[in-house]
Every structure is written in structure tokens, then in C-alpha cells.
Amino acid sequence: MKQILFMDTTLRDGEQSPGVNLNEQEKLQIARQLEKLGIDVMEAGFAAASEGDFQSVKRIAESIQNASVMSLARAKESDIRKAYEAVKRAVSPRLHVFLATSDIHMKYKLCMSKEDVLDSIHRSVILGKSLFPTVQFSAEDATRTAQPFLAEAVEVAIRAGADVINIPDTVGYTHPEEYYSLFQYLQESVPSYEKAIFSCHCHDDLGMAVANSLAAIEGGALQVEGTINGIGERAGNAALEEVAVALHIRKDHYKTQSSIILKEIKATSTLVSRLTGMMIPKNKAIVGANAFAHESGIHQDGVLKEVTTYEIIAPELIGESQNLFVLGKHSGRHAFTERMKELGYELTQKERDAAFEAFKALADRKKEITDEDLRALMLGEAALLTQQYNIKQLQVHFVSNHIQCATVVLQDGKGNKYEDAATGAGSIEAIYHAIQRILEMECKLVDYRIQSITQGQDALAHVHVELKEGPHQVSGFGVAQDVLEASARAYVHAAGKLKALLTLVK
């Protein structure tokens, strides 16, 4: 069986989704979960993009032990050296250098001739190999590149030392048959083809990213790139969880294997969704809430008689918990700690103490605490650790004519408290106005979403907000049993990130 490598770009391409702005701690959280998932290569970011990106890539590179850590770089010496400084301490550092090869990009974006492009590819890969043990070259907009020139560019990159060649469908233009044929063409037309691993990278503009990725694998690609939940700019990228499960379920056809730990898919998908604020459609393949639901009477009858009549994927395969194990207010520290370990959380004593206190507070208000509650609780605690301000007091009361008044007390990391009050057309608007007054900000709320994490009247609420000031847009989330408290936490989380961002760019 062919071994397929999985390269995840959730932290780079995925973060380019509008409104997604992960901080360093959140990126590290996702990176560690990707490591548990069995990802072979993770693109931690674009080190040369900003100091914040550089620090995030550097920290991930120093923390990950069981996957290659890669930084994106343009075909520029400064970018390549910056990428090296960021990932040089990784167990397995890798460079991803790219340059466009299509006529439209060379003419209008690069303003370069074909000869200039080939020379730039040669020089950048040579430099990369002098610094990195592994170099990946991407021919940006490969699917709209004239095939003879693409083959020439790929040959130049391999001869210069490129170990991996990526053939990206940058604008989601191709279709499965065409993409398969392109990989076959390169196999026949590139003299040094056998000296490199070929990779596919598909965007979903025409809804074919996963299908194209699978076609590329059939065509000879040994590495597949994408993101968790298919997030990314425009219509997103190939959803890696869909590719992984498709290869597993239809291994009779694809005859491949990979290092992906399928039972970690659900946990990874949920974490990425909640940290980015990009909710998963209920009907999404593999990880959607309805992926294993049956409403039709005929389907229900069939499943009850024999599950394989209408289910080709067992929920347990992807870690969809069927566990009815619950905790409650009488559960002790030992039971809580053991359950957190079973869910994959390795906590320090300080983190364990804080999480247990939060658990006991929740257990006083909620009869039964499920695994989903615990995951949400940990997500909320992680958010609190990265916030500049925490909510100490929140009070709302009715004034008149649908006007509400909110009083908010925030506390910063040094213990200083700040209090203010404001009115609004509803409780949430009043709370947000009060927080704005305290933080002296005039940001605009561009998105507000609320989701029930578990079922029942005592369910936890997960609120996601997006704030914008000028060209800068960030997201934040809050988790609490009370909707107003969750909403306030989400706003403070986002506002703190935006305030820090504005301070950096001034």
C-alpha cells in the first residue's frame, strides 16, 4: 500500500479565513491536537508576515515532537532566512517556498519573464537547501499554468534540491479528471520526477477540493494538503478529515495508508471550530451533527436491524463519543482528573486546580456534566488564560422602553479593577457598550453567534463574536451557562485581542 503523507495548513491557510485571528496560545493548542491526530507536516504559519506570526511559528517549532514543522516563504532571501530562524529548533524543520508560474500571475502580479521565474526558483531552493534538511516548492496557480512550463519549473526545483513538489489548485479551478491527468503528465514529463514527493493542495471554489485531492492521489501524489473542517480563504480548502476517512473507508480502491489517528478527528474538528468561531454545518460530511443521524422511517428501521444498511462509517471511528459517563457535583478531584486524562488533557498542577474549581462551580448549577461540557470548560479556561481582562462582575437591569442598563467590572492581569455602566437596546448591547467605555474602544460588532454546546435547559452556551476597527478584524469566544455571561466573555476576549493588535500596528 502507498503511504500518504498529510500536510495540515490550518494554522496558515486556514487562518486566512475572514474574521479568524488566533493568538499564539490558541495556535499552540491546535498544533498539539494536530500532533495527536497524526499529521505528518504542519504549516505553522508565514514567519516573515509579522512579528506575531514569527513568534507563533517559533513556539510551535520548539513544542512539537512528532511532526515536521514548516514555515511558508516567498522566493525571497529575507523570507527564507526568517523562516529558518523561526523553525530551526524544530525536531524536523521544513521550508515551504512558493512562486507563481501561470501566465496571468507572471504578467500581472510578478511582472517577471519565464526566465526570471525559473532563475528565482533555482536560487530560492538552493538557498533553502543550504539551511533546511527538507524543502518544499509550490508552483502557485499550477492548474492554470501551461503544462510544458510547469514541468520545466518543477524540474528546475528538483535539480536545485527540492524534496517535495506541490502542485496547487490555487483558485479551485480544476476538476478531478483534469487534476489526475496533470499529475500523470508530470510523471511522464519531468526527468527527475522520482527524486521528489509530489503533493496536492486544493481549494474549494467549485466544491471539488476533496474530490480533486483524491484524484491527485490516484494520479501519483504522495502528500495531500488541506485544513481541518476545510476552512480557508474564499470557499476554503480540502477538508483533511474527509480525505482521511475516504481513504480509509475505500482502501479497497485507493490502496493507501497513512499515519492519521482517525479517532482524534472529532476532537480536532471541535477544537478548530470553537477556537476559530467557524461553526460546522450540521450536514457536513464526517463531523457534522447530522452525519450519523437518521430521520426517515425506512432508514431508522434499517439501521435498527443492521447498522451497515445505511451507515458506512461507525461514529466511534472518528471519536464521536457514545460514552454516557457523566460527572456531577459529588464527583471528586480524582475522578475529574482521570476523566480529563482520558479526554487527552495533560494539565499542570495550576491548570488542574483552576479547571477543577471551574468544574465544581459548573456542577453546582448543572446536574450532569458530560464530555462535551468538559471540553467546553477547558476551552473557556484556555481563553481566560490568554485574556488581558477578566469579568469580575456583571449586572443588568431594565430602564424603560426596551432600554437596558449594564454595569460591568473588569480586572486586568495585575489585579486592577475597572468599572463602568452603559445603556443599550437590549442586555447584550448594554453590556458591550459598558465594556467599550472601560477599554476606551470604538470597535464595530460585525458578527454575533450563539450555540448550545450540550442539550437540555442547563446547557452551556458558546458565543462567538467578531469585532472590527479600521482594517483590523478579530474574533473571540466565551463559554458559560448564562448567555449574557458567555456574551460578555466573548466580547472581552475579542476586544483584548483587538486592543493588542492595534497597539502593535501603531
Curated annotation (Swiss-Prot):
Quaternary assembly: Homodimer.
Enzyme type, top EC level: transferase
PANTHER family noted in UniProt: 2-ISOPROPYLMALATE SYNTHASE 1, CHLOROPLASTIC-RELATED, HOMOCITRATE SYNTHASE-RELATED
Stretch list, region Regulatory domain: 390-506
SUPFAM superfamilies the UniProt entry points to: 2-isopropylmalate synthase LeuA, allosteric (dimerisation) domain, Aldolase
Cofactor: Mn(2+)
Annotated localization: Cytoplasm
Entry GO CC: cytoplasm
Similarity-based family: Belongs to the alpha-IPM synthase/homocitrate synthase family. LeuA type 1 subfamily.
Keywords tagged on the record: Amino-acid biosynthesis, Branched-chain amino acid biosynthesis, Cytoplasm, Leucine biosynthesis, Manganese, Metal-binding, Transferase
Stated role: Catalyzes the condensation of the acetyl group of acetyl-CoA with 3-methyl-2-oxobutanoate (2-ketoisovalerate) to form 3-carboxy-3-hydroxy-4-methylpentanoate (2-isopropylmalate).
Annotated positions binding Mn(2+): 13, 201, 203, 237
UniProt pathway annotation: Amino-acid biosynthesis; L-leucine biosynthesis; L-leucine from 3-methyl-2-oxobutanoate: step 1/4
GO molecular function: 2-isopropylmalate synthase activity; acetyl-CoA C-acetyltransferase activity; manganese ion binding
Primary localization: cytoplasm
Protein name: 2-isopropylmalate synthase
EC number of this enzyme: 2.3.3.13
CDD domains for this protein: DRE_TIM_IPMS
Transmembrane segments: none
Pfam family of the protein (one): LeuA_dimer
